[in-house]
């Protein structure tokens, strides 16, 4: 049985490349913002292009924040891309204005302190040895397009047996978070769908990790 994946359709630019890349990775893909598709797919992909505050507003307009939250609370796989990663943190600061994020992870999205922004092009990453997403592509380069990033990570593991998230880093002016793997909740700052063979392998790693049980109901 093929894993079912919904790419969240909320007006975030051209997502067709993500749909095609996920199909090549072996998923049955639906582009939708309908609750049935978002909640019941084996995996949900949250793309994001543009300003933090704008993306948050667009997600709210289709009730996506609640649906993403339900999936996370239910332990259902989610992969967020680019600004999709950023909105999972506590806040985003753009042009002096702070916008609350979903708060799944601690941290603030801020302008990268680099001479040239946006950070546009290929860059290497430093993935942890136990990374599922980067299995087979730890030494590869990925494609980034962003001006903002999370430059600090301070995750408090409150439960003794809780496994801390696997955090992957890259650098442009300063170190920033390139990816996070937190159980069923994963996110990348780069665009795997635009990252050639390395991105294709990463997406296949994620699709292969899905339960592939069809459209299960979320309680």
From Swiss-Prot:
Heterodimer of HisH and HisF. Keywords: Amino-acid biosynthesis, Cytoplasm, Glutamine amidotransferase, Histidine biosynthesis, Hydrolase, Lyase. Pathway: Amino-acid biosynthesis; L-histidine biosynthesis; L-histidine from 5-phospho-alpha-D-ribose 1-diphosphate: step 5/9. CDD domains: GATase1_IGP_Synthase. InterPro entries: Class_I_gatase-like (IPR029062), GATASE (IPR017926), Imidazole-glycPsynth_HisH (IPR010139). This is Imidazole glycerol phosphate synthase subunit HisH. It is found in: Cytoplasm. NCBIfam families: IMP_synth_hisH. One of its GO terms (cellular component) is cytoplasm. Residues 4-216 form the Glutamine amidotransferase type-1 domain. IGPS catalyzes the conversion of PRFAR and glutamine to IGP, AICAR and glutamate. The HisH subunit catalyzes the hydrolysis of glutamine to glutamate and ammonia as part of the synthesis of IGP and AICAR. The resulting ammonia molecule is channeled to the active site of HisF. GO terms for molecular function: glutaminase activity; imidazoleglycerol-phosphate synthase activity; lyase activity. Pfam families: GATase (PF00117). It catalyses: 5-[(5-phospho-1-deoxy-D-ribulos-1-ylimino)methylamino]-1-(5-phospho-beta-D-ribosyl)imidazole-4-carboxamide + L-glutamine = D-erythro-1-(imidazol-4-yl)glycerol 3-phosphate + 5-amino-1-(5-phospho-beta-D-ribosyl)imidazole-4-carboxamide + L-glutamate + H(+); L-glutamine + H2O = L-glutamate + NH4(+). The keyword Lyase applies. One of its GO terms (biological process) is L-histidine biosynthetic process. Its main location: cytoplasm. Transmembrane segments: none annotated. The active site is at 82 (nucleophile), 191, 193. Its EC number is 4.3.2.10, 3.5.1.2.
